[in-house]
Amino acid sequence: MSANPLRVLAIANQKGGVGKTTTAINLGTALAACGERVLLIDADPQGNCSTGLGIGRTQRRTTLYDVLMGEAPVVDAAVKTELPGLDVIPADADLSGVEIELGQTARRSYRLRDALEAIRANGPYTYVLIDCPPSLNVLTVNAMTAADAVFVPLQCEFFALEGLTQLMRTIERVRGSLNPRLEIQGVVLTMYDRRNSLSEQVAKDVRAHFGDKVYDAVIPRNVRVSEAPSFGKPVLLYDLKCAGSQAYLKLAREVISRERDRQAKAA
């Protein structure tokens, strides 16, 4: 059973190196493997999400830049990936010019939200995942303004919670002025090393702070997860049996289950 209506999630953390793009790629893949119809939006000018899904530069004729500039609808910008049910709107370096080009344009913060309206009611997708850049700029603001909720990957490292403070302030600002419905979807612990007592302590602190917003599924440090992007593949298509793949499948099932519960309560 697929989630319906569409759920738009901004995958964000304003601290770099937390596994944000890795989570976007592999959660999107795992959701599609579970039967969902997923659109990944690469909102980072570096284009790592696109590269990690095997979308070469020649396949990026239409990108998120074109969508935000009003030159292409979402459905025309979406590129099919190797996995049925998973499409991506790619990014390239042009995206870094959006902030200047939009300038003081009316509704500059609503560009992505307006573009997604066309697929909210009867589009082909059940989930949209937006891979946000780590910096707070017009791309991050557009992602959060378009999103129903923010999905937070959190690395099991010493300064993990410190990075969250800035993200929470950003969410509050967006909620106050642009998107009052924005909420925290959940927090997923990444790069977890059970041999390291620090990982255990960070996990304990995060669960104490966020309670049931923290997913039970934990993404371990896993060499196969690290290797997969260099082959242009999500880890599930690179090595399905590895611990990283199984963790992302567990996370996807948990996301779907929680979404069904949320919809049931809202009905």
Curated annotation (Swiss-Prot):
Keywords, in A-Z order: ATP-binding, Chromosome partition, Nucleotide-binding
Binding site for ATP: 14-21
Pfam family, one: AAA_31
GO terms (BP aspect): chromosome segregation
InterPro entries cross-referenced by the UniProt entry: AAA_dom (IPR025669), DNA_Partitioning_ATPase (IPR050678), P-loop_NTPase (IPR027417)
Family note: Belongs to the ParA family.
Record's function text: Involved in chromosome partition. Localize to both poles of the predivisional cell following completion of DNA replication.
Official protein name in the record: Chromosome partitioning protein ParA
